[in-house]
């Protein structure tokens, strides 16, 4: 029988240094409420011009160096802990202060907002991390219009690697589409990661069953407590994500 690790820690990576906005703060005040995970803001700038795909790394987050493709542009913002930098991006692309406030508030429920000429969606990505044997939680926000999609995240993870690979491998479905389709691809990827996390949860339940029957010890009660708390957090995220996706599908029936 395989050895089971003593967990005695939450199965989810949690944000232990939450920043709470001061009550009475004016709407649109930009405060990053999460834990800084990267040293500085950086961009991955993807230009789509038909069959011509260029992926440019902007390591220092230089806004003046951002390029835009003739067909479609994807700007992946890694690091949202710098409110001034995020505000400057908002000014460049016409993103309102209330939307920027939502981007920096990493502890909120998923939502979709139709802004008329542009759109905004934010959601929690829960994915299994093999390196630390936990389910990691990451907020991802997406602002998009007819020509550009901007994704915002704090962690320099490989969350979007499958999409970058599809772009690099010449996936024609992306070449002739607009940012709304790319946004849908991002959300589809997040749903897939939820399913992977579900498989991990199933595995942990089986481990607990074996441990209860064959290897009960003093840590079991605490392990189950942490697991239950993490599982409830996972289940809470699902209906909110489903609602955000449903609102997007209602607004974009032509491509979904």
Feature map (PLM): residue ranges:
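Peripheral, non-transmembrane regulatory/ligand-interaction domains of membrane transport proteins
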Residues: 1-255
């Amino acid at each position: 029988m395989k050895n089971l690790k003593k967990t005695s820690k939450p199965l989810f990576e949690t944000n232990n240094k939450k920043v709470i906005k001061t009550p009475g703060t004016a709407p649109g005040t930009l405060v990053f409420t999460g834990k800084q995970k990267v040293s500085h803001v950086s961009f991955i700038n993807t230009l789509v011009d038909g069959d011509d795909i260029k992926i440019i790394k902007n390591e220092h987050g230089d806004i003046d160096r951002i390029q835009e493709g003739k067909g479609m542009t994807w700007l992946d913002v890694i690091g949202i802990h710098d409110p001034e930098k995020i505000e400057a991006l908002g000014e460049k692309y016409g993103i309102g202060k209330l939307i920027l406030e939502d981007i920096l508030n990493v502890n909120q429920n998923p939502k979709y907002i139709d802004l008329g000429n542009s759109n905004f969606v934010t959601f929690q990505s829960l994915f299994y991390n093999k390196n630390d044997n936990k389910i990691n939680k990451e907020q991802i926000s997406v602002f998009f219009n007819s020509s550009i999609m901007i994704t915002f995240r704090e962690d320099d993870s490989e969350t979007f690697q499958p999409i970058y690979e599809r772009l690099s491998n010449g996936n024609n479905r992306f070449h002739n589409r607009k940012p709304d389709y790319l946004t849908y691809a991002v959300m589809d990827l997040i749903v897939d990661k939820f399913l992977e996390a579900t498989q991990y949860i199933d595995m942990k339940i089986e481990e607990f069953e074996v441990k209860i029957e064959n290897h009960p010890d003093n840590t079991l009660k605490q392990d189950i407590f942490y697991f239950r708390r993490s599982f409830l957090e996972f289940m809470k995220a699902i209906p909110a994500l489903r609602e955000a996706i449903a609102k997007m599908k209602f607004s974009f029936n032509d491509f979904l």
